[in-house]
Each structure stands twice: as C-alpha cells, then as structure tokens.
Regions:
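Start-transfer (signal-anchor) and selected internal transmembrane alpha helices
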Residues: 1-16
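Membrane-interface coil-to-helix junctions
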Residues: 17-79
Length: 189
C-alpha cells in the first residue's frame, strides 16, 4: 500500500509538472519579474519582524528562480503535491479506512486555479502548506493533554511564521478536538 501511495504522488507530481511547463511556462517568467527578493540582512530582518514574514521570505526566495526554465513549474508542482500529501495524512487520520484519492487532490486543484491569477502570490500556497503540515503533525500526537498544549503553542508560532492562516489552523484544531470528543476539548478554544 505504501508503494501505491508513493507511485500515486509521483504520478500527480509528474502530471502537474508537465501540465504547468507545457501550458504556463511564460506565466512563471511574468510572476518572477513582478516580485523582488533582496538578499541583504536588513531586508530579511525587516521581513522576519512582520507576522507572516517567514513565509513571505520563503515564497520570494522561491519565486526568484522562476526565471530559470522548468523551475517555476517544478516549484509549483512540488508545493501543490506537498499540499496533497498533507491532506492525505489528515484524511487518513480522521477516516483511516477511506480510499478517497480524489479527496486528496481537491485542495491541490483549488490552489492550482489560484496560481493562474497573476495577482496571486506563491506566499499563499507556502502558508497553506505550512498550516497543513503542522495540522498533520498535530493530529499525530496521541496524548490529549500534550496535543492541546501543542495546539496552544502552535497557533501563535504559526501566526508569526505564516500570518493569518493560523486562524484556519485554530479552527481546524477546535473542529478536530470536538469531533474526537477529547475530554475537555473546549480548552482548545
């Protein structure tokens, strides 16, 4: 089963890469020229002082390479595949026996369509991937008390790293704890 999932995600990544490279190659060049990444200490420090500044730096760092052939499609396909893998981990944690592969791909498709907009920034996908990865890790914690404490710590950390996506993370944590009927789940509110 593990090899089946790896093969599935490799096929998804390859299909995304091929689609993006053949149909939207010049889109990535345009996106790169509309953003600027300065590799100076002052610029990085000023960005890191802002909530969500870390994700902004990561996104701008990745976008600067979109000028190179194939890199824009490669980075975008990798980010979207990462979102799909995290979604699969979350769905398997909630409903372990479901084999709904299409459910894993739906958030990827929504983000893919948003990437077609010239005004959409890669930072949104980076933030969403960070939130999904933390949520997937959060759901793997077995001890109820440790999980609730981790949730209370992760929300402000995620807000500092990725910005307002932390509100979605907090809502998903409350929903997860409420549906699991964790004793004193309301503490997560």
């Amino acid at each position: 089963m593990k090899y089946k999932l790896v093969a599935f995600w490799l096929v998804v990544f390859g299909a995304l890469f091929a689609f993006l490279q053949t149909r939207f190659e010049y889109h990535f060049y345009y996106i790169e020229q509309s953003q600027l990444f300065l590799f100076t200490e002052a610029y990085i420090r000023n960005k890191l002082l802002l909530p969500g500044g870390f994700s902004m730096l990561v996104a701008e760092f990745l976008v600067q390479f979109f000028i190179r052939p194939y890199v824009g499609a490669l980075v975008t396909a990798a980010l979207l595949t990462g979102v799909g893998v995290c979604t699969a981990g979350i769905v398997k944690r909630i409903a372990p026996v479901s084999g709904l592969f299409i459910l894993y791909v739906l958030p990827m498709l929504a983000l893919l369509f948003m990437h077609f907009d010239f005004n959409y920034r890669v930072q949104g996908t980076v933030c969403y991937l960070m939130m999904m990865a933390l949520l997937c890790g959060y759901m793997r914690i077995r001890n109820d008390l440790f999980r609730l404490v981790a949730g209370c710590v992760l929300v402000p950390v995620l807000f500092w790293l990725a910005g307002s996506i932390a509100v979605l993370f907090a809502g998903m944590v409350c929903l997860f704890e409420g549906l699991r009927k964790t004793p004193k789940w309301y503490i997560s509110l």
